[in-house]
């Protein structure tokens, strides 16, 4: 079952997945919020655990593929990017010529990002916005690029988030999504499962005092659509020239699309 599978629950409402657990659709966002409130201060460390530290290399590849220009007025929105990690990389790559909007539904994550922006001298180049990826508070054709890293699998309605991404991009705009994916190497998948389901929750308890949050994050990765299926979803949202690159045996994949 993919993250977009829906069933009718016992209360009559539609169901969605929270990791491996089926819940009423209306519950998912608040439950996901709870997870990220609890891990906000340790979010980058969490990604180190989930990716064995490789997320930093993957993010650098994401920025290289985006190739943000050193042009004043070039605007990017980074969705589910509360801690600012992707936005900071984009601003540095553009020599602080670009302007970034960091959008996240979770104020704890945004607070971490705001503090880091001040520390790194990047606050003048970033707006932090608390809002929902499914209902972006921006006009049509507002941005030159849309990025999202390790966030879209936590959105209750992925199709709505993709439609909103298409709407707010200018013609010629770029969509890039970095996400944990479906491991394709026979031995690596077994080793990664062992790491994910046995080691990660224990490390989550040790580092953040919250094994359940880390268990959800692992399960949410397994529930996310496979690379080809997600590419089809991007295409259905209206994007052209849709493609993806696998990283590290497909532990993660970087998806790209253009608004033509």
Curated annotation (Swiss-Prot):
Enzyme type, top EC level: transferase
An MF annotation (GO) of this entry: 2-methoxy-6-polyprenyl-1,4-benzoquinol methyltransferase activity
Keywords: Menaquinone biosynthesis, Methyltransferase, S-adenosyl-L-methionine, Transferase, Ubiquinone biosynthesis
Pathway(s) served: Quinol/quinone metabolism; menaquinone biosynthesis; menaquinol from 1,4-dihydroxy-2-naphthoate: step 2/2; Cofactor biosynthesis; ubiquinone biosynthesis
UniProt keyword S-adenosyl-L-methionine, yes or no: yes
Coiled-coil stretches noted in the UniProt entry, renumbered to this chain: none
Pfam families linked: Ubie_methyltran (PF01209)
E.C. no: 2.1.1.163, 2.1.1.201
Catalytic reaction annotation: a 2-demethylmenaquinol + S-adenosyl-L-methionine = a menaquinol + S-adenosyl-L-homocysteine + H(+); a 2-methoxy-6-(all-trans-polyprenyl)benzene-1,4-diol + S-adenosyl-L-methionine = a 5-methoxy-2-methyl-3-(all-trans-polyprenyl)benzene-1,4-diol + S-adenosyl-L-homocysteine + H(+)
CDD domains in the cross-refs: AdoMet_MTases
InterPro entries according to UniProt: SAM-dependent_MTases_sf, UbiE/COQ5_MeTrFase, UbiE/COQ5_MeTrFase_CS
Binding sites annotated in the UniProt record for S-adenosyl-L-methionine: 83, 104, 132-133
GO biological process: aerobic respiration; menaquinone biosynthetic process; methylation
Family statement: Belongs to the class I-like SAM-binding methyltransferase superfamily. MenG/UbiE family.
Function: Methyltransferase required for the conversion of demethylmenaquinol (DMKH2) to menaquinol (MKH2) and the conversion of 2-polyprenyl-6-methoxy-1,4-benzoquinol (DDMQH2) to 2-polyprenyl-3-methyl-6-methoxy-1,4-benzoquinol (DMQH2).
Protein name: Ubiquinone/menaquinone biosynthesis C-methyltransferase UbiE
Organism encoding this protein: Bartonella bacilliformis (strain ATCC 35685 / KC583 / Herrer 020/F12,63)
């Amino acid at each position: 079952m993919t993250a977009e599978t829906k069933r009718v629950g016992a209360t009559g409402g539609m169901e969605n997945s929270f990791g491996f657990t089926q819940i009423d659709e209306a519950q998912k966002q608040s439950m996901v919020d709870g997870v990220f409130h609890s891990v906000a201060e340790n979010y980058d460390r969490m990604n180190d655990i989930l990716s064995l530290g490789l997320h930093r290399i993957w993010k650098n590849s994401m920025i290289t593929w985006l190739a943000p220009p050193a042009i004043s007025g070039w605007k990017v929105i980074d969705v589910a990017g509360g801690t600012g990690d992707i936005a900071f990389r984009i601003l540095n790559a553009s020599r602080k010529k670009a302007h970034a909007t960091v959008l996240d539904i979770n104020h704890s994550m945004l607070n971490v990002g705001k503090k880091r922006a001040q520390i790194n001298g990047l606050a003048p180049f970033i707006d932090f916005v608390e809002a929902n990826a499914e209902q972006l508070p921006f006009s049509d054709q507002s941005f030159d690029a849309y990025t999202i890293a390790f966030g879209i699998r936590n959105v209750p309605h992925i199709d709505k988030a993709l439609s909103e991404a298409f709407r707010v991009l200018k013609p010629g705009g770029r969509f890039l999504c970095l996400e944990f994916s479906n491991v394709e190497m026979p031995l690596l998948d077994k080793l990664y499962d062992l790491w994910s389901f046995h080691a990660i929750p224990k490390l989550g308890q040790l580092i953040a005092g919250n094994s359940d949050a880390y268990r959800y994050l692992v399960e949410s990765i397994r529930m996310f659509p496979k690379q080809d299926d997600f590419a089809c979803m991007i295409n259905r949202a209206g994007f052209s020239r849709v493609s993806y690159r696998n990283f590290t045996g497909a532990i993660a994949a970087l998806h790209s699309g253009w608004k033509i």
